[in-house]
């Protein structure tokens, strides 16, 4: 299944959920409660079944991290093999530990999609070595740096200037465009609008 590349705002509005986690998709006077379409479809949509709620939660988080269904499902399967902890939390921690997400959290890109492009194009170093795999699982203590040739890039400078992230599991040296994945995040540090229990229910039926 291909990765969605359409309008971020349109998709965010459909889910009533800020994909960028800062509400900027709704900053042009549009309300997040409005569903795309002529009049938000019909009101029956509000009375969602358990199956529908699970599917929607899975879809919105998959879109938030910019992953294909196969990538998302494989990450969940990996989370099921983690010993200890809560499955839903372990799953979110694996998503947060992706290299493209850490680049986004450090503020080197304004969106996860832009962060993924930086990684894909070889503009990111991990522990001093070029790494162009967005799904790479960054480990606590790993250092992440923008390649020297890109350190004067206007888009990266703009992203850093507008970065509003306050998460404490990463630290960034804005002057030198370097950062570190300090530790694994705690559940309360991650998006509290995500109902990971619904995603667990969805995939537990499919992955044994």
From Swiss-Prot:
<dbReference type="GO" id="GO:0015935">
    <property type="term" value="C:small ribosomal subunit"/>
</dbReference>
<keyword id="KW-0699">rRNA-binding</keyword>
<dbReference type="Pfam" id="PF01479">
    <property type="entry name" value="S4"/>
</dbReference>
<comment type="subunit">
    <text>Part of the 30S ribosomal subunit. Contacts protein S5. The interaction surface between S4 and S5 is involved in control of translational fidelity.</text>
</comment>
<feature type="domain" description="S4 RNA-binding">
    <location>
        <begin position="97"/>
        <end position="160"/>
    </location>
</feature>
<comment type="similarity">
    <text>Belongs to the universal ribosomal protein uS4 family.</text>
</comment>
<keyword id="KW-0694">RNA-binding</keyword>
<dbReference type="InterPro" id="IPR001912">
    <property type="entry name" value="Ribosomal_uS4_N"/>
</dbReference>
<dbReference type="InterPro" id="IPR018079">
    <property type="entry name" value="Ribosomal_uS4_CS"/>
</dbReference>
<keyword id="KW-0687">Ribonucleoprotein</keyword>
<dbReference type="GO" id="GO:0006412">
    <property type="term" value="P:translation"/>
</dbReference>
<dbReference type="InterPro" id="IPR005709">
    <property type="entry name" value="Ribosomal_uS4_bac-type"/>
</dbReference>
<comment type="function">
    <text>With S5 and S12 plays an important role in translational accuracy.</text>
</comment>
<dbReference type="GO" id="GO:0019843">
    <property type="term" value="F:rRNA binding"/>
</dbReference>
<dbReference type="InterPro" id="IPR002942">
    <property type="entry name" value="S4_RNA-bd"/>
</dbReference>
<dbReference type="InterPro" id="IPR036986">
    <property type="entry name" value="S4_RNA-bd_sf"/>
</dbReference>
<comment type="function">
    <text>One of the primary rRNA binding proteins, it binds directly to 16S rRNA where it nucleates assembly of the body of the 30S subunit.</text>
</comment>
<keyword id="KW-0689">Ribosomal protein</keyword>
<dbReference type="GO" id="GO:0003735">
    <property type="term" value="F:structural constituent of ribosome"/>
</dbReference>
<dbReference type="InterPro" id="IPR022801">
    <property type="entry name" value="Ribosomal_uS4"/>
</dbReference>
<protein>
    <recommendedName>
        <fullName>Small ribosomal subunit protein uS4</fullName>
    </recommendedName>
</protein>
<dbReference type="Pfam" id="PF00163">
    <property type="entry name" value="Ribosomal_S4"/>
</dbReference>
<dbReference type="GO" id="GO:0042274">
    <property type="term" value="P:ribosomal small subunit biogenesis"/>
</dbReference>
């Amino acid at each position: 299944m291909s990765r969605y590349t359409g309008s971020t705002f349109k998709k965010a509005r459909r889910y009533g959920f800020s994909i960028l986690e800062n509400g900027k998709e709704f900053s042009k006077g549009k309300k997040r409660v409005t569903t795309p379409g002529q009049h938000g479809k019909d009101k029956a949509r509000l009375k969602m079944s358990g199956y529908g709620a699970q599917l929607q939660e899975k879809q919105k988080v998959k879109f938030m991290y910019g992953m294909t269904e196969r990538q998302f499902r494989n990450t969940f399967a990996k989370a099921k093999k983690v010993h200890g902890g809560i499955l839903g939390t372990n799953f979110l921690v694996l998503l947060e530990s992706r290299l493209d997400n850490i680049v986004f959290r450090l503020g080197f890109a304004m969106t996860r999609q832009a962060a993924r492009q930086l990684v894909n194009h070889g503009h990111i170093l991990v522990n001093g070595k070029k790494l162009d795999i967005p799904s790479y699982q960054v480990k606590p203590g790993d250092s992440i740096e923008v390649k020297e040739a890109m350190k004067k890039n206007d888009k990266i400078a703009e992203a850093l200037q507008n970065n509003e992230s306050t998460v404490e599991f990463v630290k960034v040296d804005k002057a030198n465009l370097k950062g570190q994945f300090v530790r694994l995040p705690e559940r309360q540090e991650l998006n509290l609008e995500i109902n990971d229990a619904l995603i667990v229910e969805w995939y537990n039926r499919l992955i044994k």
